[in-house]
Amino acid sequence: MTARLSTALGAALLACACGAMAAPAAESESDDMVRLLNDRGLLVQLGDQLGQVRHTVGEKASELVMNAMGFLGVPYQRGGSSAETGFDCSGFVRAMYHQTVGLILPRRADQQAAATTTIDKSELRPGDLVFFNTMRRTFSHVGIYIGDNKFIHSPRSGSEVRVEDMRLGYWQTRFNGARRVQASDSQP
């Protein structure tokens, strides 16, 4: 997925999620994006997730979350850190923070947990990091919280960037904690 397509997809998702009315000049661009998403089979895949985002994030969605949503469907790639090659979980989080906020987080999920500020699960807000024990070790998986107990992540080999509910049994039993990224948490 090119950066231009990613940006356009993010903008289309933002418009859909917020229920924004497009200006007449922008309607053709929006229609073109809908056709592109439909032609690639992404509109059907994103349908339910767009509805979740509309109700979950609404107008309070951070630029980080909306940018991340633009990468739905990008394949998982172990060690991957770009849309062109695919993402692993920590590569996805690192890329989103670097692209959107300009912060460079550590590469591995456990390093990201150690470098960020611990918060209580009840304090989660869109853009915070959520960590899970998926490989029999703490902080072995990371995602970006988007609100309403949902997070976006790159889960595992053979899958792609997607939104999931933290209340599902698998994620609920493996939850390790929540972290907030502060400007001082980035590496030079």
Task: For every predicted segment, state its role.
Residues 62, 66-70, 91-95, 99, ...:
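Solvent-exposed, polar/charged alpha-helical surfaces in well-ordered, non-transmembrane soluble domains
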Residues 68-80, 96-105, 134, 155, ...:
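Sec/Tat-exported extracytoplasmic proteins
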Residues 166-188:
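Acidic, glycine-rich catalytic/binding loops that coordinate metals and/or anionic ligands
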Residues 74-126:
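Catalytic cysteine-centered active-site loop
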Residues 15-20:
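Short hydrophobic alpha-helical membrane-anchoring segments
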Residues 2-10, 21-75, 181-188:
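Intrinsically disordered, low-complexity
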Residues 4, 55, 103-160, 165-168:
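...with weaker cross-activation on analogous glycine-rich loops/strands in unrelated enzymes
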Residues 55-62, 83-91, 118, 169-172:
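Soluble non-cytosolic domains of exported or imported proteins
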